[in-house]
Regions:
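Transmembrane helix-loop-helix hairpins at membrane boundaries of multipass inner-membrane proteins
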Residues: 1-9, 27-122, 195-219, 225, ...
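Membrane-entry segments of alpha-helical transmembrane domains in multi-pass membrane proteins
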Residues: 2-15, 31-38, 42, 77-95, ...
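N-terminal signal-anchor/start-transfer transmembrane helix
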Residues: 14-29, 101-102, 236, 240, ...
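Alpha-helical transmembrane segments and their helix-start/interface "positive-inside/aromatic belt" motifs
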Residues: 33-46, 172-184, 379-388, 444, ...
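Hydrophobic alpha-helical membrane-insertion segments
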Residues: 43-58, 181-194, 388-396, 498-522, ...
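Membrane-helix interface motif
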Residues: 59-65, 193-204, 398-410, 511-541
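Aromatic-capped, Gly/Pro-kinked transmembrane alpha-helices
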Residues: 61, 76, 81, 493, ...
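Hydrophobic transmembrane alpha-helices and their helix-loop junctions in integral membrane proteins
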Residues: 102-146, 152-485
Length: 684
């Protein structure tokens, strides 16, 4: 029997981290450093515990879909704050609050000696509040508020080291690129509002058939297709899909804890969640789905290639995020929304683990992020080593780890799809399995195995070996850390405990969740629509997968007969051979394939293209408008009018000679002119 969740309990979930954020931010000096982290952790812990309760209540049949605050009415349009809590929302709430809680605890150790300690805790709690408001919304207005709020807070966090020029450039880049996506997102919302007459999900979904029948006058463009593509452009910005991906690697300029929160559970997952929530609309447009599939495939494969040439440990993990987001997007495109959400969940745990593990390595290495200066750390950082190995195994899709179940399910769904673009997508996601394993275990072997390179002089191109600091996490610099050549060391318990707690779901959550989420009734009983996630009968991939599914054990055992597991193994073996067995080979390969390496090292020149075409292009257009539009036209009208009046006044002044006969002559000429005019007109 369906029951309604308690409204006050739901309100407490986003308000608890908001309260912690406000106290730490506005009264940071009064509460002190300990007070700031205690009050924000308490707020997020309350949100997590209440989210867990809501999750179990929803599993028992409870739900909620109602307005909690009416802001204003504009004609027949209602602007409201409301919550829609179903299985999708409840799962997202648990993931967001749990990962956020781990990041909050981890931050105590990682940011221990930073001057902006209270400010940072305030920001990450505000980030949690923003994401909760986004996933809990039941209308497009609140969705857009949460959407913009996570963008704003990410701007503040990426630019946390605001005295560093590279950080300011990175947060401005993230802000501007996301504005491009948000413009498309706003257009999509505007189209739905204009033709559906409502911002409430349920009311818009109820008119989906009517919307699908509409076309723009004089074109074959379906209204719903255009609206869905516009909505997805918003997702391309938030979830960093090609070509709006360029901001995400530069977000590494922020402290490592926020990198984990952005990449694992908040901002970049917002686009995936939004498209899944809008499945009743997207299912009516194969054109939009094909567009999504191709964009996701490009991102999954080509962003993975960039991870191979990175030397900054955080940037390797960042490019893995881009690639995995591509996987999720491909799943959305082939109508496997539950699989996309499933991978979103498993990815949140192992990606947070990998980022926080990278931060632990950075702390143990006295703030060095260059993997060329590491090696052999497993002896010095055993907990970080084991947990990072767990995260890497989950990332590459090792059988029985969580990432295996979600990633292989995506590959199977793409294989069974018949949408245009699915053939290319299948090639991309399969090839990306090898690429993912290669860059993941390149990182793992360079950091934890092999020669102890930290005993040698720093690599001349690394941030620690030269004056340039681009991409370097300045955590703790100048705040009392002992930066001289000590051996690496394991980090404090407050840092490694979150790693252990994240490692557990990175192993087991896939096996636990695959059956109910993909082949059970987890997404069946909807509130705003018939089903939480709707899949049309013309997209049967998931239904066909269900026929072949024989439990999580059977799936793991059966994987040895499939291509992906062997590609992953091949990637690991190649990484071992190149970076442990024959470490001199990568330099030779780089010289042999110089142009390709240069292309990858310059990130396909996307930053250069954006700078030349958009940045300089905008400046050139602005300069042209200023010179031709402002100076010539506008100033010409204003100054030209003044000059004309001056000239005319000069002419008039010439006529004012002061001689009476001049005036008499003018009067006579005038009278003759008037008489001539009257006679002429009278004759007609």
């Amino acid at each position: 029997m369906s029951t309604t969740l308690n409204e006050n309990l739901l309100l407490a979930i986003p308000l608890a981290p908001l309260a912690g954020s406000l106290i730490a931010g506005l009264f940071g000096n009064a509460v002190g450093r300990k007070g700031a982290h205690r009050i924000t952790i308490l707020g997020v812990m309350i949100a997590f515990l209440l989210s867990a309760k809501v999750f179990f209540d929803v599993m028992g049949g409870a739900s909620f879909n109602a307005t909690v605050y009416e802001w204003m009415n504009v004609g027949s349009l209602k602007l409201e704050v409301g919550f829609l809590v179903d299985s999708l929302t409840a799962m997202m709430m648990v993931v967001v609050t749990f990962v956020s809680l781990m990041v909050h605890v981890y931050t105590i150790g990682y940011m221990a000696e930073e001057d902006g300690y209270q400010r940072f805790f305030s920001y990450i709690s505000l980030f949690t509040f923003s994401m909760l408001m986004l996933v809990m919304s039941n209308n497009f207005l609140q969705l857009f508020f949460g959407w913009e709020a996570v963008g704003l807070v990410s701007y503040l966090l990426i630019g946390f080291y605001f005295t560093r020029e590279s950080a300011i450039y990175a947060n401005m880049k993230a802000f501007l690129v996301n504005r491009v996506g948000d413009f498309g997102f706003l257009l999509g919302i505007g189209l739905l509002l204009a033709f559906a007459g409502s911002m409430n999900y349920g009311e818009v979904f109820a008119k989906r058939a009517e919307l699908a029948s509409l076309h723009f006058p004089g074109t074959d463009w379906g209204l719903l297709t255009v609206a869905c593509i516009c909505l997805f452009i918003g997702a391309m910005g938030k979830s960093a899909q090609f070509p709006l991906h360029v901001w995400l690697p530069d977000s590494m300029e922020g402290p490592t804890p926020i990198s984990a929160l952005i990449h694992a559970a908040t901002m970049v997952t917002a686009g995936i969640f939004m498209v899944s929530r809008m499945s009743p609309l997207f299912e009516l447009s194969d054109t939009a789905l094909s567009f999504i599939t191709v964009i996701g495939a490009i991102t999954a494969l080509f962003m993975g290639f960039l991870g191979i040439v990175q030397n900054d440990i955080k940037r390797v993990v960042a490019y893995s995020t881009l690639s995995q987001l591509g996987y999720m997007t491909v799943a959305l495109g082939v109508s496997a929304y539950p699989v996309a959400v499933f991978h979103l969940m498993t990815h949140a745990f192992f990606k947070a683990l990998l980022f926080l593990g990278a931060g632990s390595v950075i702390m143990g290495m006295h703030h060095d992020q260059d993997m060329r200066n590491m090696g052999g750390l497993r002896k010095y950082m055993p907990i970080t080593w084991i947990t990072s190995l767990v995260g890497s195994l989950a990332l590459i899709g090792t059988p029985f780890f969580s990432g295996f179940y979600s990633k292989d399910s995506i590959i199977d769904a793409v294989k069974l799809s018949h949408l245009p673009g699915s053939g290319f997508a299948y090639f991309a996601v399969v090839a990306s399995v090898f690429v993912t394993a290669l860059y993941s275990f390149r990182m793992y072997f360079l950091v934890f195995h092999g020669e102890e390179r930290f005993r040698k002089p720093k690599h001349p191109e690394s941030p620690m070996g030269m004056a340039a600091t681009h991409g370097h996490d300045d955590h703790g610099h100048g705040h009392g850390h002992d930066d001289h050549a000590h051996e690496p060391h394991e980090t404090p318990w407050v840092v490694w405990v979150p790693l252990v707690l994240l490692a557990i779901p990175s192993v087991i959550i896939g096996a636990i969740a695959i059956s109910p989420m993909l082949f059970g009734d987890f997404f069946q009983h909807g509130v705003a629509f018939d089903k939480v996630i709707f899949i049309g009968e013309n997209h049967p991939a998931l239904a066909e997968m269900a026929e072949e599914f024989h439990g999580w054990v059977g799936m793991g055992l059966h994987s040895v007969s499939g291509l992906p597991v062997w590609l992953a193994l091949a990637g690991v073996v190649v990484a071992w051979f190149l970076y442990l067995k024959r470490p001199e080979l990568p330099a030779s390969i780089r010289r042999a394939f110089g142009p390709i390496y240069t292309l990858l090292d310059n990130k396909y020149y996307m930053d250069k293209i954006n700078e030349v075409v958009f940045a300089r292009g905008s400046v050139a257009i602005g300069r042209g408008l200023w010179k031709e539009g402002d100076v010539v036209v506008i100033d010409g009208l204003v100054n030209g009018s003044a000059r004309f009046i001056g000239w005319f006044a000069g002419v008039i002044r010439f006529l004012q000679s002061g001689y009476i006969y001049h005036y008499a002559f003018a009067m006579i000429i005038g009278m003759l002119g008037l008489l001539t005019l009257f006679v002429t007109l009278g004759g007609k």
